[in-house]
Every structure is written in C-alpha cells, then in structure tokens.
Amino acid sequence: MGVALTRSAQWTAAGHGAKTLEVTPLNEAIVKEIIMFVESFIYKYPQEANYVFVEPLEWKTNLDPSAFGSGYAVSGTTVKSEEADKNGEPLLYLSVPQIKIRSFGQLSRMLYIAKNMKLKEAQACIEANRNPVAKILGLDYNIISEKIGNSFVSNILDKITKDDDSESEIKMKIALQLKQLDLHLLNHSLKHISLEIRLNPGTVKNDIELLKQFSGKGKQTVLESIEYTSDYEFSNGCRAPPWRQIKGEICYVLVKPHDAETLCVTCSKEGVFLNGGKTDDEGQINYERKGEIYKDLVTLLKEKSAIFSENMSKQEIKFSEQPQKDQPNEAPKEEVAITHKASVTSRKSTQEKNRINLGRSQLTKRLEPSLNWRTSVSSKDRNTLRDTQVEKHGGKLEKSRSSVSPGRAQLIRKSVEKIEEIISDSSSESEEDEEQPDHRQEANADLPSEYWQIQKLVKYLKGGNQTATVIALCSMKDFNLAQETCQLAIRDVGGLEVLINLLETDEVKCKIGSLKILKEISHNPQIRRNIVDLGGLPVMVNILDSPHKSLKCLAAETIANVAKFRRARRVVRRHGGITKLVALLDCGKHSGEPAQSSLYETRDVEVARCGALALWSCSKSYANKEAIRKAGGIPLLARLLKTSHENMLIPVVGTLQECASEENYRAAIKAERIIENLVKNLNSENEQLQEHCAMAIYQCAEDEETRDLVRLHGGLKPLASLLNNTDNKERLAAVTGAIWKCSISKENVTKFREYKAIETLVGLLTDQPEEVLVNVVGALGECCQEHENRVIIRRCGGIQPLVNLLVGINQALLVNVTKAVGACAVEPESMMIIDRLDGVRLLWSLLKNPHPDVKASAAWALCPCIQNAKDAGEMVRSFVGGLELVVNLLKSDNKEVLASVCAVITNIAKDQENLAVITDHGVVPLLSKLANTNNDKLRRHLAETISRCCMWGRNRVAFGEHKAVAPLVRYLKSNDTNVHRATAQALYQLSEDADNCVTMHENGAVKLLLDMVGSPDEELQEAAAGCISNIRRLALAIEKARYS
C-alpha cells in the first residue's frame, strides 16, 4: 500500500500546507480499492482484524458522534469504543474533529458507520497518514523504504525467525496482505492509466485556434475570449515550462465564457482541467488541479458554461446547413489583415475547409506546423473586429476578409489596446498579461513599399554615422507609424534593438529621435512586449533622471504606452521608476534650464503631465499603488489637481481614480482635501474628465465622511444633472456609480430627491448596458429605504422594469435588484404590483442561484414580500418545491445565506400549514445544527426562527432532543440587544417543555434572564419573565412531588 500511494497516487504540489490527494479518477479508483480491502478485512481475516496497531491512524473526521451506536460510549463530542487493548485503551477514540483508530476491525466498522462519507473519510485518513504501514506494523515493516520483490519477503522471514511468537506471525500475515494490496493497486493503476485519454500538442492547438474563430463579444459567439498564457512555443508544440512538460502538461489557456468568470485551464496529455489560476504575488500559475479531468477543452467548457453549450449547438446546426457557404474563390468584401490577398485567401480557404464541428470527437485532420512566420491579424484582433461588426450589424457576425487599409489597422490596434487595458484589472497585482502570439511578416508576401523603405532606413541606423543616424530617424518619423505595417517593418528587421541601443548613447538628438519613434509604435501590444523583452524599460527609466525636459517627457510618455500590461509595470517598479515618475510631478523646483517664464512654465506642466500619464498606467497594480503612496505621490497629485490645464487633469484624476480602490489612499485623499477639487471638475465641459472625477468619487464614497464632503462641496447637483446625458455610456456608468455610493447616506438621498434624480434613475432602467444598470439599481435600492422614494418609484412605473431585471445572470445586478425589489415590497401597493408581475416567484427561483450573495439578497427580499402579501400562506404553498428548497438552504456554509434563510422561514412559519410542511422537511434538526454559532446576525434570526417553529406539534421537544437549548442560553451573553430579545422569546417557547427547562437551569439561564427582566425593552422583559416563570413552576412542581 505504501508504494502504490507514493508512486501511483497523484498528490498536490507541496505548497504552504501538507500534500493532499488530487481529485482525479485514478486517485478515486485507488481509494475505492483500499475501502473494499478494509471493509472485507474483518470478515476475511477476523484474527488479524483484532491486531492492535503500533501507532494509531489519526486524522480530522467529519463524522458526528451521534452516528456511533452500540459498541461505543458517546459523551458529548467524544466517542470511545468498548473494544480496548490490553492496557484498557480504546481502539477507537473520537474527540471532534480528531479520530484515532488502532485496529482493522475498528477501521472496517468506521467505514460502515460513515456510509456515504466513507470516500472522504478514507481520503482524509490516507492524506494524514502518508506512511500507514509504518504506523500499523512499525518501522521495521516500512514498505516505502523496501523494494518490491523477494527481498521484502526475505526480510519479513528474518524478522519472524528472530521473534518467534504469535504477534510476529500475525504481523507477517498482515504485512503480506498489505504487500498483495500494494501490487493489486499498482496493477489497477496501470489498467486505469491505459484507458485514459491521451492528447497531443497538435490536437490541443487546433481546438484552441478553432475556438478563437468563434469567440468575441457578440451574442452568437461561443466565448468572449480564449488566449494562451504564454506566447512561446517549444519545438515539440508545447507551451508549458519544461519542468511541467515532464508531468505531461502541454499548455495553459485563459478562457472567458459569457456567463462565468475567467477560467485558467491546463491542457495535458491526460486531458483538460481547471488549475488554481494566477497567484497574487508574481502572477505565476498555480498548477494544482481544481476539479475533474475532461477529455478535451470543449467538453470542459460545455460543463462550465451553459451559453457555450447552447451556442456551440447553434454553430453545429449552422455549419451543417450551410456547408458550401464559404468558398475559396469568393471575392473579399471587408479588409481584415495587412497582407497579400492571394496569400491570405489561400490560407483562409484552408481554414474554411478544416472548420468542423468542435462538439464532436477529436479532429481527424490536423494542421501541419510551419517554420514560416506569418503576418495575420491575431485571434484577439479577429475577435475585436467581430465585436465591432456585432455592434454595427445588430449582432450578426460578418466574415473576415483578406486585406486591410491603414485606417482599419489603426482601428484594430486601438480596439486590442482597449481590451488589454480592461483585462489589466485595476484592483489587484494579480492581473494577468493577455499575451498575444508573435506575428511576423511572411518573407514572400507582397508588402507595401513603405515596408521596404523603412527596412532600408533601419540599415542606415545600424551602420551609419551620427549624421546619417539622425537623418534616418527623422525620415522614419515622417512615415505613418500608427500603421501596423510600418510598426512591424521596424521590428522585423531588428530596428527595435537599434532604437533601444540609441537610448544609451550620449547624443541627445539620437535619444529624442529614437524615443519619438518608440512612443508612436509602442501603441502596438506586440511592440510593447518586444520592448520589455529587449530591456528597453530600464533604459527609459534611467532617462527620467536626465536634465533635458524633452527627453524626460518622451521617456515618460513611452513608459505610459508600454506599461499597459503587468510584466511591464513590474519592471518599472523594480528599477525605481515609480519614485522617478513621482519626482516628475514636482520637477519645476529642480530645473536648471533658462528662465524664460512662459516656456519654462509650459515645459514644467508638460513634464508633470507626462509623469502623471505614466503613473496612471502603472497604477493599475496594487504594488505600484503602494509605491506611489510611499514616494509621496498623493500631495503632488493633489497640488496638480488645482491646475486649470485639462490635459494635465485627466491623467492626474485617472491615477487618483485607480488608487482610490485602496483604503490607505482614500484616507490620504481625505487628508489632502482632494474631494473638493474632484467635485469642482465635475462641472468641466470635458467628458473624459467628468468621467474620471465621477469614478474617483465612486471609489472614495465607500467612506461616510467622503459622502458628506461630496454633499457639502455641492457635488450632488452636478452628478444628478449628468444623468440627463446618456450618450456617453462610460461616463454614465461612472456617474451612476458615484450616485449609488453617495446614496448610502440618507442626507444625500434627500438631496437627490430634490434634484429629481430618482425619476431620472427610473428612466435609466431600460435600454442600458449592464455596467450602468448595476449602478442605477444599486442607487434605487438605497433610495428605496425611505417611504417617499418608494412612492416616487411606483408612480414613475419603476416596479415593472425592476422585476424584469430579476431574470438576468449578472451577479452584481441580481444582488442590487433583489435589494431594490425587497425594499419596494414594504409598500402594500408596490407589493400588489410585484405579485401581479410574478416577482415573488422570480425571487424564489433566485434561491437556486449558485452565487451565495444572490441567494442571500433574494432571501432578504422575500421577507417583506411574505409579510405584505394578501394571502402569504397560500402564495408560498403555490411554489412547487419552494418550501423544501428553503429548508435545504439551511445546509449552506455561508453565514449571510443562513441568516437570510432563517428570516424567510420565520415569516413562512407564521402560517400553521406551512409550518407543518417545513417541519416534515426536517427544519428542526437543521436549525439545531446551526445553534453553535458566534455570528450575532445569524444568532438573532436563528433564535426568531426557533421561537416561531416551536408553535407546531412536538417541535419544542425535538429542539431539546437535538441539543439546541444549551447553545441558545449562551446567546444571552452577547452584546447585541436584538440577539437578547430573540433568544429570550425562543427560550420562553422552549421552556414550555420540562426537559428544556432543566437544560436551561443547568446552563445558567436563570441568572442571565433575571438581568434582562430589568431591560427597557418591553418584549425582552416579557419573554425573560415568562421563561423564568416556567422554570420556576417546574421547580415548584418537582419540590412538591418530592415531599408528597
């Protein structure tokens, strides 16, 4: 057994904790075989089953002490077996959660008791006891250190010869049985492995490339995006590091489905599975497997994404109905790639012929690898173009065509850049590079004349003198460097290396010319990565110390372009770039240039603007935010915020907006009085500046003091007025977000009501993107806490669009809309509308949502719906399976879900018929299991639920039998008065049963309740007094019975 567990079983990599068994079919098969061996051991080898282990097998169990019956002594949270060794020590000892077992007989009985949990228990035992043979038989029988074969048997025979007694003979028999099990497990593993699916790099690559063709933002696409985590491809077709290729891993891909978070997937020879994703520190992949192994990528995605599965079936139908739609000789209608038409058409026809149904079995024909670099728009560019076409043509995907104009190439470049910025998330250092495949021009392509002209200029840069170099740089600058052909021409002939080398010369003119070109071409995502790979960023960081302001400006602007992805931002920080960029914000004090006032001031402003621009790009990672703060960036940004230069204000506010996501920054922003200037710039005519100011307020308004400052400085009125301009969706999302967060304060809600913002918000509930809807509904949810605002929303017809949004899939939107609907349901008139629109059923269906936040919010919303419905009992019973669903939610691990569900059950149980139904569904034992909690919110609602459930049948007695009374008494020691009131009411109801009274008295309830009789809360007084009265009556009755 030791060798099989060491060599065949698949263990997780040694991280911060102990190794665990991976969740693989092979491991499951091994564990099941071990279970079968142990379960049958007691019957096949009854004498050996009584053998006492040298050391107990010990692990953390999930078994409940109550599961043990005859043959065991159960006392509270401990269990002892009646069967003991010669010293009287029990062979099984459980002290929750630790369990110790010292014989095969007890192991076999434990598995019988575990029932459905036996697999988990066996796995936990194996993980906690990596060398079980040594513990069972002693170190002399340690199979792990022995070689399988005759040497093992001979060693055992030697031991028996030396120790000629019955115990040694039993040990020998057990050792041989374990050796046979070991060999059986090894053979079983080999058979299992031989049946597993084996993928190869070509299969995986073609599947990913074909999926890319059907990816994008359109409704008909199967995925939003799918990208490799690494551009580098080894000669064997793998992209995984060599030390992972040894384990059979081929590559790693980031997949973004339409209806789920981004998935980090490992493609290996054994199959495809989810890994641990990107780590927070260095952005490396956590290679540990998190889930099942699937035969291919399509199968995994069908399991994880309903939209993928649905759209894949549509693609199958589409291609089966129109097999002849795309012919190689079709005339190109739209420009997509910068390359020769004949070359691309030929390649495209090959792709069209090879395009097949991804949902079927593995591809039968694979693309042959090529040594030629090709120039083509990357898969990401194609996705971006497809998304643009979806927006223009109502969601219909247009086919890509063969060539592209310079303007079209620039559009693609900007779109790709925007996607990359979105992926480079602003909230955390764990954002990941969206690395793209490295595309180069094909040698024999018919390229524009500019391509060859630029390559000639690069040759002059390489071999010319200083004068020739400057002339070549000036000539190169005259080309349209925004055109991708020109950018790639510079790179393909080695021009990037030359330009970066020029930055290390002493000639200022050469540096300026080189930086001007690098600044233009670094808008291209591939060029950015090439610059980082060639070590260009450290050189630019050093230039920031130059006394020449023009050089500093160009270097900072180029850094701003390059630092759009995580690796580049990390390089800037590690080479001291953040400190130097912060210094640029204050560069005027250290200037040594001629004091020509207007020119001097203009140059200073430009240097500070470029520095702020670079900091804005760098501030998208947490570590850089901290570096900016420690370098003293906040006071300098605050000072620049007072300037009148709009081109300066945008990057300054943008940097503050990114940084304001961190609590330390929000405190510093308050201290520097930045809110006042943010509010002031809301009145600017520049829409981009308004957007960033609103977004910064949105980030900062989590703090109550900041919300008050926004109101005091007059920021609510411009925010309300900006709601009327709905053309700019990005700005509208920022403004509605700021209004949402500001609405958390009641004083601000009153102001918004004065400015008629609530009516405007109701009007935004339709025909808006989800980013706007989340904020609009969030703001209405806060406003709905007041009666006047609920009336306004109802009169403006806001109930119906709110209820309509309950059918969405966006988690944040569902959380907000359920809160808003629940708040509206407090009004009887609104509740009638919600009921008529089937809103309660929609809320109830959200209890099945996989996201705990959505479940909890939906449950809270149901409470006022049940309270204010005309015939609540009948309404609840009308939902088929609804009561059982609510009761089963009591098995959740999320405290908020549990508290909200308890609140729902409290309202459901007001109807006696419904109370009877949920009692039949087992609500009493489930509530009793939750009693041992320290969460005051859950305690309060749990106590209220128990109080209400006591009013049916023998539920009072059942709560006592399930040991719910003693934990409730401890609730009285809480500091929360609401918990005291609910607990006293529950104890009062429970005290109607004599056994419960005894339990309360034993746990010291009387003294605690006596203190609460003097509470100013009348309900608490009454419940406490009633409970004491019941306990006292029981005591008197016992006393009377004793003397009579």
From Swiss-Prot:
UniProt main location, coarse: cytoplasm
Key words, A-Z: Cell projection, Cytoplasm, Cytoskeleton, Repeat
- HEAT repeat ranges? 448-485, 487-527, 530-568, 627-665, 668-706, 831-870, 874-914, 916-955, 958-996, 999-1037
Quaternary organization: Component of the outer dynein arm-docking complex along with ODAD1, ODAD3, ODAD4 and CLXN. Interacts with CFAP61.
Q: Which gene encodes it?
A: ODAD2
Query: Which protein, by its recorded name, is this?
Result: Outer dynein arm-docking complex subunit 2
Which SMART domains does this one have? ARM
GO BP, one annotated term: cilium movement
Q: Name the InterPro entries for this protein.
A: ARM-like, ARM-type_fold, Armadillo
The segments labelled Disordered in the record are 317-409, 423-446
ARM repeat boundaries on the chain: 484-523, 525-564, 535-577, 622-661, 663-702, 746-785, 828-867, 871-910, 912-951, 953-992, 1004-1031
Q: What tissues harbor this protein? A: Expressed in trachea multiciliated cells.
Q: Which organism is it from?
A: Bos taurus (Bovine)
Its taxonomic path starts at: Eukaryota, Metazoa, Chordata, Craniata, Vertebrata
Looking up Pfam families in the UniProt record yields: Arm
Skewed-composition ranges (Basic and acidic residues): 317-338, 379-401
SUPFAM superfamilies membership: ARM repeat
